[in-house]
């Protein structure tokens, strides 16, 4: 059951055929059957002036004993907490009674100035809606899943005579077979690299494929079978593709046995060159499996979760098994109240984790979490198949879980060490530059271009827990009046766009209040930077400070410049800070290493963004400039005509003969390449 956000803040459920009749409940609380919009109802109590437990107590009087979801809001309208309940009256009533709450709950209750509610037909629906809202609203007092980047998959395309193999992330819009999820892009890259050697499947785009007149370098180094120029027959290539699918589907022994038989037969026929090819392909398959670590025979499709909770920090390690193969693992460090138990953290994490991800048939846990039966029912409803959640006690599966627990413990220890080191570095940064408090958010900027072309500005972000990659931003330089190679002009555009938008969305911060709250452990990650680092000298800093003054935020952000020394050697950097002469740091100063690391990360990110933009420009197709021609129609045209040049020469009747191209679209394409005829 997936929700779609509505303008009024509700969620529309649209994947059911059930009745849309309203559910009648007492009071003013709105019901939320599956097929109608979630109508949050706060009643009129927010105008009474009541706050905290008194306000909650008044709400309880009109709540039903129905399952549902509630939101607690502060005086500014920010969502403090989202929760679900089997009985709204009983669950919310717990906040109003005089019993002793934890510090976290007591603080949340004191700040509550309004509440909103929605009833659901079942507690399962309430659990799914709660997870959806927590991920979208990120309330301060909920357990929050960080680093929720989608997982990459391997895609073998199915809409071309010669299927290609790609890394894929996001919606499965393209026809083909998807294999995964993999824990990281690196794991996908290594697997594709080995699969190329084993099965010789192409990795080029369709537009490049259609324009080849001779095999590319990958064919020469035996990484592709050359279907573009018919170096391999269509039947032979289809067999290679099927073998790759079989291997990724868990039939690795069948594939390896077939290759071994072919190798032995070639050797018996004294065709040693062909035998060597099969030998190398077998070695490539073994290389794939050597990177997969443990592959338990009794686990076909499962995710394995283990939690290690110590020192107020939780680490949840996840291993992914599909088709009997280990596709990698990833560690998560959810934001949670240190007073919560590991079972409470794990339960909240699981519901959010699968909110936008495919659910496997089996989920294994290192320990029992809360409401496992309810969670299994909710995930089964979402996935459309039965999902079992178990805590293995013995045997191979218990050994597997223990292995994941060990990984969680090690990752937890590394995280604590890194966090402690980062805190010391931020304190040292504060002392070095004379700041009022240790910065909680540092933004580092750099530009990248080649002679002014495809210019990109990059922004990376660092904080108490290291680099915050979901806060990175890139800025494609758009100004036409900037002289090619004008770094000052590029930085001016980046700064203006960044802070103009920040002022519009967040307003100018109150630094006095922020300094007082800088050490609060439960404060959300700030949107405004305390410090910005610019990779440049006095000229860059003069331009940046002029922009900050123009925007009226000179006192809101500390700007620091980093200029390389005369010989441009690392360790000879000169720093430009406000209110003091430029200076250098001792070569072995830890703060200097810290700043160099941040600058190098900004440099890496800016160069990477520039390369992506340059690559897109290099493979840009004239069909991309035609409105209404998306990837599918572009692919259909290229498959029919071969090249964009052939499309430009095609007659209107020929364009209309292409599958998926209507008369209106054909005229649009024809007119684009024949402007005189259009006039």
UniProtKB/Swiss-Prot annotation:
Oligomer status and interactors: Interacts with UvrB in an incision complex.
SUPFAM superfamilies in alphabetical order: C-terminal UvrC-binding domain of UvrB, GIY-YIG endonuclease, RuvA domain 2-like
Chain ranges of the UVR domain: 253-288
One GO term describing the cellular component: excinuclease repair complex
Gene Ontology biological process terms from the UniProt entry: nucleotide-excision repair; SOS response
Protein name, UniProt field: UvrABC system protein C
Predominant subcellular localization, coarse grouping: cytoplasm
Family named by the database record: Belongs to the UvrC family.
GO molecular function terms noted in the UniProt entry: DNA binding; excinuclease ABC activity
Gene3D superfamilies recorded: 5' to 3' exonuclease, C-terminal subdomain, GIY-YIG endonuclease, UVR domain, UvrC, RNAse H endonuclease domain
Domain (GIY-YIG) ranges: 65-143
Pfam family, one: HHH_5
Keywords on record: Cytoplasm, DNA damage, DNA excision, DNA repair, Excision nuclease, SOS response
Subcellular locations according to the entry: Cytoplasm
Primary role: The UvrABC repair system catalyzes the recognition and processing of DNA lesions. UvrC both incises the 5' and 3' sides of the lesion. The N-terminal half is responsible for the 3' incision and the C-terminal half is responsible for the 5' incision.
């Amino acid at each position: 059951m997936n929700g779609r956000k509505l303008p009024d803040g509700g969620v529309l459920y649209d994947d059911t055929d059930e009745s849309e009749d309203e559910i009648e409940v007492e009071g003013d609380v709105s019901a939320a059957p599956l097929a109608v919009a979630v109508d949050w109802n706060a009643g009129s109590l927010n105008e009474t002036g009541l706050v905290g437990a008194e306000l909650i107590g008044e709400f309880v009087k009109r709540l039903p004993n129905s399952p549902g979801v509630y939101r607690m809001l502060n005086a500014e309208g920010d969502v403090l907490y989202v929760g679900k309940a089997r009985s709204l009256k009983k669950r919310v009533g717990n906040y109003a009674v005089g019993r002793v709450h934890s510090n976290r709950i007591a603080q949340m209750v004191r700040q509550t100035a309004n509440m909103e509610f929605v009833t659901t037909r079942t507690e399962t629906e309430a659990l799914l809606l709660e997870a959806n809202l927590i991920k979208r609203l990120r309330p301060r007092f909920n357990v929050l899943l960080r680093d929720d980047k989608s997982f990459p998959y391997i895609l073998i395309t199915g809409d071309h005579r010669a299927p290609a193999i790609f890394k894929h992330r996001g919606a499965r819009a393209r026809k083909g077979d998807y294999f995964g999820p993999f824990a990281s892009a690196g794991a996908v890259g290594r697997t594709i690299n080995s699969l190329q050697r084993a099965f010789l499947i192409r990795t080029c785009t369709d537009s490049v494929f259609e324009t080849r007149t001779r095999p590319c370098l990958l064919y020469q180094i035996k990484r592709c079978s050359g279907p573009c120029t018919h170096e391999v027959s269509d039947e032979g290539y289809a067999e290679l593709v099927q073998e790759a699918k079989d291997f990724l589907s868990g039939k690795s022994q069948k594939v390896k046995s077939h290759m071994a038989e072919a190798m032995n037969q070639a050797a018996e026929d004294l065709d040693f060159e062909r035998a060597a090819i099969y030998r190398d392909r077998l070695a490539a398959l073994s290389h794939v499996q050597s990177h997969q670590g443990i592959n338990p025979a009794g686990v076909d499709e499962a995710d394995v979760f283990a939690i290690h909770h110590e020192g107020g920090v939780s680490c949840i390690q996840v291993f992914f098994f599909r088709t009997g193969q280990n596709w990698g693992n990833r560690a998560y460090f959810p934001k949670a109240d240190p007073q919560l138990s590991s079972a409470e953290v794990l339960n909240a994490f699981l519901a959010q984790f699968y909110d936008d991800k495919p659910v496997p048939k089996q989920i294994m846990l290192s320990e029992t979490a809360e409401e496992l039966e309810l969670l299994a029912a909710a995930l089964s409803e979402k996935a459309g198949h039965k999902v079992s959640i178990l805590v293995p006690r013995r045997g191979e599966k218990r050994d597997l879980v223990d292995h994941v627990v060990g990984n969680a413990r090690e990752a937890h220890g590394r995280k604590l060490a890194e966090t402690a080191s980062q805190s010391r570095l931020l304190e040292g940064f504060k002392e070095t530059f004379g700041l009022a408090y240790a910065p909680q958010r540092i933004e580092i900027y750099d530009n990248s271009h080649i002679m002014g072309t495809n210019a990109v500005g990059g922004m990376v972000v660092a904080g108490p827990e290291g680099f915050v990659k979901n806060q990175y931003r890139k800025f494609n330089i758009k100004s036409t009046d900037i002289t090619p190679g004008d770094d000052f002009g590029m930085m001016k555009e980046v700064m203006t766009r960044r802070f103009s938008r920040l002022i519009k969305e967040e307003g100018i911060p109150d630094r006095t209040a922020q300094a007082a709250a800088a050490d609060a452990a439960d404060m959300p990650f700030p949107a405004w930077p305390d410090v910005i680092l610019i990779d440049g000298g006095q000229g860059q800093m003069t331009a940046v400070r002029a922009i900050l003054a123009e925007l009226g935020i000179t006192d809101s952000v500390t700007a620091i410049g980093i200029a390389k020394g005369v010989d441009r050697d690392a360790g000879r950097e000169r720093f430009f800070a406000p209110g003091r002469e430029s200076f250098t740091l001792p070569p072995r100063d830890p703060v200097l290493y810290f700043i160099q690391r941040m600058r190098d990360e900004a440099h890496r990110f800016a160069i990477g963004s520039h390369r992506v933009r340059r690559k897109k420009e290099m493979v840009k197709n004239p069909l991309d400039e035609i409105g209404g021609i998306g990837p599918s129609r572009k692919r259909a045209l290229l498959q029919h005509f071969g090249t964009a040049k052939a499309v430009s020469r095609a007659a209107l009747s020929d364009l209309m003969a292409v599958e998926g191209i209507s008369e209106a679209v054909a005229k649009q394409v024809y007119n684009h390449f024949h402007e005189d005829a259009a006039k």
